Amino acid sequence: MIKNIFFDYNGTLINFEACEKEALRLAGCNYGKLITTEEIEIYQKINSALWERYNAGEISRDTVLVERFDKFLQIIGLNIKPEVFNGFYLDKLEDLFVLEPHVTETLELLSEKYNLYVVTNGVQKLVMNKLFNAKLSFFIKDVFTSERVGYHKPSLEFFSFCLENINAKPDECIIVGDSLTSDIVGGIESGIFTCWYNPKKISNNSNIVPNVEICDFADLDFTIYSLP
């Protein structure tokens, strides 16, 4: 019986892509550069590839945060230290939040039935502030970031830490997330039920099979209720 729900943060509760684009544009303008849509797409490819390496345990989070802009700034010809650009970008990102549709009302409903948690490889300060600003922190019992845990999703150690801290068995939990390689793999390997949040209805051509799939948060309550 499900008692606890782990939510991924970026791309699941928060429409991170919208926030990311605006923060990039603001950072570019601050340093005299109008960043185009095409350039944002270049950044997203660089950033995504680095986070994949992080999820695979090949590089550290700090390396991701700096190296992504080291490469990107060279490509767009902006002569700014990547550490400086990253700092400004994160400050702006902290102030921005765009919720995925139906998140607030769904969390409010689910919080009356389950214990809700956030599990993320995101930055601790950023996540905590965004949850507060988005008025979601009231529904969330605890936040587990890779920074706090010392391991990152999808590692077994990350989820073991979470389960131990909430005193729960794997079959009492479900993880809801948009990443097959991070959220769903981590849940499967930890024995946790998995729900793939797939709002863009992307085809799953991998061998990673979640227990359930939703494209709208409004369907989550019934989906979890219907689990065996």
Task: State the predicted function of each range.
Residues 1-5, 17-18, 29, 80, ...:
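Asp-based, Mg2+/Mn2+-dependent phosphohydrolase catalytic module
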Residues 2-101:
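N-terminal helical cap/lid subdomain that shapes the substrate entry/recognition surface
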Residues 101-102, 157:
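Short, conserved clusters of charged catalytic residues that mark active-site
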Residues 102-113:
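Catalytic-core regions built around general acid/base machinery
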Residues 113-114, 191:
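Glycine-centered short loops/turns at secondary-structure junctions
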